């Protein structure tokens, strides 16, 4: 039987509706949640992401400002802007759109964001809190994956979870979040000896490696939950995930499509984190 679709668009719309209600409640208490997005340079994909974030904020009633800086902006100038935003009482969340130009040290910039405004969840202190299980902002994409599981009624407790990819943005944090929910977690990467054998063990398989259609149906356990974080452009117009959707959907119990799976969840979680920051 073909897999059930984990519809990220539908679930993200539910999350956004919850956020909109929470924003109204906060405004009634005199708190107006605010997000600042910083974009350096002209990267076309980044421009689209930033536009989408700004529009999503408007839809739920979050105040949003976008700071567009030229690609030649110095690191010192960028750090000065972040310092100003850290001190700005109307801004509760700060997001620096990655990637940054090569001459800017990404790590230094992320470190400069005040912990209580780090709604992307990337700062070392935030990541440390995630690892030890303290209160933190969950990084948006991993959090989106967990909410997809939750809304589908899938409890990771006692299940074997395999995460393909070990990036700081998705692979590592989603592994930690699954661990916190009592899954048994394996992280696979480019040096994993037998990726197919590892994937076949998974009750929950999360693919976040950035390789088009790397994971095929024969690598998937019957009835597994497959969450595809990858978004890869093939040719001029086609977008595909890290999972070969057609073959995987014949084996999986649940699967996310690409596009329309994890992507919409990422922005919904950013809105959720911004409201959480305002509430704190």
Swiss-Prot record:
Reaction(s) catalysed (UniProt annotation) = (6R)-5,10-methylene-5,6,7,8-tetrahydrofolate + NADP(+) = (6R)-5,10-methenyltetrahydrofolate + NADPH; (6R)-5,10-methenyltetrahydrofolate + H2O = (6R)-10-formyltetrahydrofolate + H(+)
Q: Name one GO molecular function term.
A: methylenetetrahydrofolate dehydrogenase (NADP+) activity
Pathway the protein acts in: One-carbon metabolism; tetrahydrofolate interconversion
Provide GO CC annotations from the record.
cytosol
Enzyme Commission (EC) number: 1.5.1.5, 3.5.4.9
| Record-linked SUPFAM superfamilies | Aminoacid dehydrogenase-like, N-terminal domain (SSF53223), NAD(P)-binding Rossmann-fold domains (SSF51735)
Q: How does it assemble?
A: Homodimer.
Give GO terms for biological process. L-histidine biosynthetic process; methionine biosynthetic process; purine nucleotide biosynthetic process; tetrahydrofolate interconversion
- Coiled coil (UniProt feature): none
Species of origin reads Moorella thermoacetica (strain ATCC 39073 / JCM 9320)
PROSITE patterns of this UniProt entry?
A: THF_DHG_CYH_1, THF_DHG_CYH_2
Q: What is the lineage of its organism?
A: Bacteria, Bacillati, Bacillota, Clostridia, Moorellales
Binding locations of NADP(+): 165-167, 190, 231
Which superkingdom, per the lineage? Bacteria
- Which protein family is named in the record? Belongs to the tetrahydrofolate dehydrogenase/cyclohydrolase family.
List where the protein spans the membrane. none
Instruction: Provide this UniProt record's keywords sorted from A to Z.
Output: Amino-acid biosynthesis, Histidine biosynthesis, Hydrolase, Methionine biosynthesis, Multifunctional enzyme, NADP, One-carbon metabolism, Oxidoreductase, Purine biosynthesis
Protein name in the entry: Bifunctional protein FolD
Gene name per UniProt: folD
Which function does this protein serve?
A: Catalyzes the oxidation of 5,10-methylenetetrahydrofolate to 5,10-methenyltetrahydrofolate and then the hydrolysis of 5,10-methenyltetrahydrofolate to 10-formyltetrahydrofolate.
Gene3D superfamilies the UniProt entry points to = Leucine Dehydrogenase, chain A, domain 1 (3.40.50.10860), NAD(P)-binding Rossmann-like Domain (3.40.50.720)
| A Pfam short name | THF_DHG_CYH_C
């Amino acid at each position: 039987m073909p897999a059930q679709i984990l519809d990220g668009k539908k679930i993200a719309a539910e999350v956004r509706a919850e956020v909109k209600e929470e924003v109204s409640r906060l405004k009634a208490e005199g708190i107006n949640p605010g997000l600042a997005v910083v974009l350096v340079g002209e990267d076309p994909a980044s421009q689209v992401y930033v536009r989408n974030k700004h529009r999503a904020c408007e839809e739920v009633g979050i105040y949003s400002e976008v700071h567009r800086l030229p690609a030649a902006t110095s690191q010192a100038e960028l750090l000065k802007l972040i310092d100003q935003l850290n001190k700005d009482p109307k801004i509760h969340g700060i997001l620096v759109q990655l990637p940054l130009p090569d001459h800017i040290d990404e790590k230094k910039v992320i470190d400069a964001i005040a912990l209580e405004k780090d709604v992307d969840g990337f700062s070392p202190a935030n990541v440390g809190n995630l690892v030890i299980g303290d209160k933190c902002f969950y990084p948006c994409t991993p959090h989106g994956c967990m909410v997809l599981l939750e809304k589908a009624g899938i409890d990771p407790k006692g299940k074997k979870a395999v995460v393909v990819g070990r990036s700081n943005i998705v692979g590592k944090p989603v592994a930690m979040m699954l661990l916190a929910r009592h899954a048994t977690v394996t992280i696979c990467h480019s040096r994993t000896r037998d990726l197919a054998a590892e994937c076949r063990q998974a009750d929950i398989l999360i693919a976040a490696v950035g390789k088009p259609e790397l994971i095929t149906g024969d690598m998937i356990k019957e009835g597994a939950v497959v969450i595809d974080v990858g978004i890869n452009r093939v040719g001029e117009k086609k977008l595909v995930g890290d999972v070969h959707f057609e073959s995987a959907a014949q084996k999986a119990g649940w699967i996310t499509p690409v596009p329309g799976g994890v992507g919409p969840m990422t922005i919904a979680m950013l809105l959720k984190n911004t409201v959480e920051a305002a509430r704190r």
